[in-house]
Amino acid sequence: MSYAIIRNEKYTKDEMIQLAPHNERFKKKYSNKNIDLSKTSQNYHLKRPQENSYLKEYQRLIKENNLSQGQLHKNSIYVCEVILTSDNTFFNEIGKIETKRYFEECFKFMTEYKGIGKENILSAVVHLDEETPHMHLVYIPVVNSKDKKGNSIRKISASEFWKGKDSYKK
Protein backbone atom coordinates (compact mmCIF):
# COMPACT_ATOMS: atom_id res chain seq x y z
CA MET A 1 0.00 0.00 0.00
CA SER A 2 1.29 3.44 -0.95
CA TYR A 3 1.20 6.54 1.24
CA ALA A 4 1.41 10.27 0.59
CA ILE A 5 4.65 11.69 1.95
CA ILE A 6 5.00 15.30 3.12
CA ARG A 7 8.21 16.76 4.49
CA ASN A 8 8.42 20.33 5.79
CA GLU A 9 11.69 22.21 6.35
CA LYS A 10 12.43 25.76 7.52
CA TYR A 11 15.13 27.85 5.82
CA THR A 12 17.18 30.94 6.65
CA LYS A 13 17.98 33.57 4.03
CA ASP A 14 21.23 31.88 2.94
CA GLU A 15 19.57 28.46 2.80
CA MET A 16 16.64 29.88 0.79
CA ILE A 17 19.06 31.26 -1.79
CA GLN A 18 20.55 27.77 -2.21
CA LEU A 19 17.13 26.15 -2.86
CA ALA A 20 16.50 27.81 -6.22
CA PRO A 21 19.38 26.27 -8.22
CA HIS A 22 18.15 22.76 -7.38
CA ASN A 23 14.40 23.37 -7.49
CA GLU A 24 14.42 25.52 -10.62
CA ARG A 25 17.17 23.49 -12.35
CA PHE A 26 19.44 26.49 -12.96
CA LYS A 27 22.60 24.37 -12.99
CA LYS A 28 23.92 22.17 -15.78
CA LYS A 29 25.38 19.56 -13.43
CA TYR A 30 24.18 18.13 -10.10
CA SER A 31 25.79 15.96 -7.44
CA ASN A 32 22.45 14.14 -7.06
CA LYS A 33 22.81 11.10 -9.32
CA ASN A 34 19.01 10.63 -9.42
CA ILE A 35 18.60 13.70 -11.65
CA ASP A 36 18.30 12.79 -15.33
CA LEU A 37 18.89 16.07 -17.18
CA SER A 38 17.46 14.58 -20.38
CA LYS A 39 14.07 14.52 -18.59
CA THR A 40 14.29 17.99 -17.01
CA SER A 41 12.05 19.43 -19.73
CA GLN A 42 9.23 17.27 -18.27
CA ASN A 43 9.34 19.21 -14.98
CA TYR A 44 6.57 21.78 -14.62
CA HIS A 45 5.37 24.53 -12.30
CA LEU A 46 2.07 24.86 -10.53
CA LYS A 47 3.32 28.30 -9.49
CA ARG A 48 6.36 29.75 -11.22
CA PRO A 49 8.36 32.51 -9.52
CA GLN A 50 8.12 35.84 -11.36
CA GLU A 51 11.69 36.72 -10.38
CA ASN A 52 14.86 34.81 -11.30
CA SER A 53 15.93 34.20 -7.69
CA TYR A 54 14.08 33.13 -4.57
CA LEU A 55 15.45 36.14 -2.68
CA LYS A 56 14.06 38.57 -5.27
CA GLU A 57 10.75 36.66 -5.36
CA TYR A 58 10.62 36.74 -1.55
CA GLN A 59 11.22 40.50 -1.53
CA ARG A 60 8.57 41.00 -4.23
CA LEU A 61 5.97 39.00 -2.26
CA ILE A 62 6.80 40.83 1.00
CA LYS A 63 6.16 44.16 -0.69
CA GLU A 64 3.15 43.04 -2.75
CA ASN A 65 1.39 41.38 0.20
CA ASN A 66 2.40 44.02 2.78
CA LEU A 67 4.01 41.47 5.09
CA SER A 68 5.82 42.39 8.30
CA GLN A 69 9.24 40.78 8.76
CA GLY A 70 10.02 42.04 12.23
CA GLN A 71 13.65 42.18 13.30
CA LEU A 72 15.75 39.82 11.19
CA HIS A 73 18.81 37.94 12.38
CA LYS A 74 21.26 35.67 10.56
CA ASN A 75 19.33 32.59 11.72
CA SER A 76 15.83 34.03 11.07
CA ILE A 77 13.52 31.76 9.10
CA TYR A 78 12.50 33.31 5.78
CA VAL A 79 10.66 30.46 4.07
CA CYS A 80 9.55 26.88 4.48
CA GLU A 81 9.64 24.17 1.86
CA VAL A 82 7.27 21.25 1.65
CA ILE A 83 8.22 18.25 -0.47
CA LEU A 84 5.22 16.14 -1.48
CA THR A 85 5.52 12.69 -3.02
CA SER A 86 4.66 9.01 -2.71
CA ASP A 87 6.51 5.88 -3.83
CA ASN A 88 7.47 4.86 -7.38
CA THR A 89 4.98 1.99 -7.43
CA PHE A 90 2.13 4.42 -6.81
CA PHE A 91 3.14 6.73 -9.67
CA ASN A 92 3.80 3.85 -12.07
CA GLU A 93 0.35 2.41 -11.35
CA ILE A 94 -1.61 5.65 -11.77
CA GLY A 95 0.16 6.89 -14.93
CA LYS A 96 1.06 10.37 -16.18
CA ILE A 97 -2.40 11.95 -16.23
CA GLU A 98 -3.28 10.89 -12.69
CA THR A 99 0.22 11.82 -11.50
CA LYS A 100 -0.41 15.36 -12.74
CA ARG A 101 -3.80 15.39 -11.00
CA TYR A 102 -2.16 14.08 -7.80
CA PHE A 103 0.22 17.05 -7.70
CA GLU A 104 -2.56 19.50 -8.55
CA GLU A 105 -4.49 18.14 -5.55
CA CYS A 106 -1.35 18.38 -3.38
CA PHE A 107 -0.98 22.02 -4.43
CA LYS A 108 -4.63 22.73 -3.66
CA PHE A 109 -4.30 21.02 -0.26
CA MET A 110 -1.22 23.05 0.67
CA THR A 111 -2.66 26.39 -0.46
CA GLU A 112 -5.77 25.81 1.63
CA TYR A 113 -4.10 24.00 4.56
CA LYS A 114 -3.42 26.33 7.49
CA GLY A 115 -4.03 29.26 5.15
CA ILE A 116 -0.72 29.10 3.28
CA GLY A 117 -2.45 30.77 0.32
CA LYS A 118 -1.18 31.03 -3.26
CA GLU A 119 -0.05 34.60 -2.63
CA ASN A 120 2.56 33.37 -0.11
CA ILE A 121 4.09 30.73 -2.39
CA LEU A 122 7.40 31.53 -4.07
CA SER A 123 7.45 28.41 -6.22
CA ALA A 124 5.72 25.07 -6.68
CA VAL A 125 7.61 22.85 -9.11
CA VAL A 126 7.06 19.19 -9.92
CA HIS A 127 10.21 17.19 -10.66
CA LEU A 128 9.74 14.32 -13.07
CA ASP A 129 13.45 14.10 -13.87
CA GLU A 130 14.37 12.18 -10.73
CA GLU A 131 13.77 8.57 -9.72
CA THR A 132 10.52 9.39 -7.87
CA PRO A 133 8.18 12.23 -8.94
CA HIS A 134 7.83 14.90 -6.26
CA MET A 135 6.87 18.54 -5.78
CA HIS A 136 8.91 21.27 -4.09
CA LEU A 137 6.61 23.97 -2.70
CA VAL A 138 8.44 26.96 -1.19
CA TYR A 139 6.29 29.38 0.82
CA ILE A 140 6.43 32.23 3.31
CA PRO A 141 4.93 31.21 6.70
CA VAL A 142 2.48 34.07 7.36
CA VAL A 143 0.32 34.53 10.46
CA ASN A 144 -2.26 37.14 11.44
CA SER A 145 -1.07 39.16 14.42
CA LYS A 146 -1.17 42.59 16.07
CA ASP A 147 1.54 45.23 16.10
CA LYS A 148 2.51 47.18 19.25
CA LYS A 149 -0.36 49.62 18.65
CA GLY A 150 -2.91 46.80 18.38
CA ASN A 151 -3.34 47.06 14.61
CA SER A 152 -3.89 43.86 12.65
CA ILE A 153 -0.87 42.81 10.61
CA ARG A 154 0.25 39.83 8.58
CA LYS A 155 3.70 38.83 9.74
CA ILE A 156 6.25 36.18 8.87
CA SER A 157 6.77 33.66 11.65
CA ALA A 158 7.52 29.98 11.10
CA SER A 159 7.34 29.24 14.84
CA GLU A 160 3.87 30.79 15.18
CA PHE A 161 2.73 29.31 11.87
CA TRP A 162 3.55 25.74 12.90
CA LYS A 163 3.30 26.14 16.71
CA GLY A 164 5.49 23.10 17.27
CA LYS A 165 5.30 19.53 16.09
CA ASP A 166 1.80 18.87 17.47
CA SER A 167 0.20 21.35 15.04
CA TYR A 168 0.98 19.02 12.12
CA LYS A 169 -1.80 16.72 13.35
CA LYS A 170 -4.48 19.43 13.16
PLM features per residue range, with description:
Residues 1-170:
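N-terminal nicking endonuclease/strand-transfer module with a His-rich metal-binding environment
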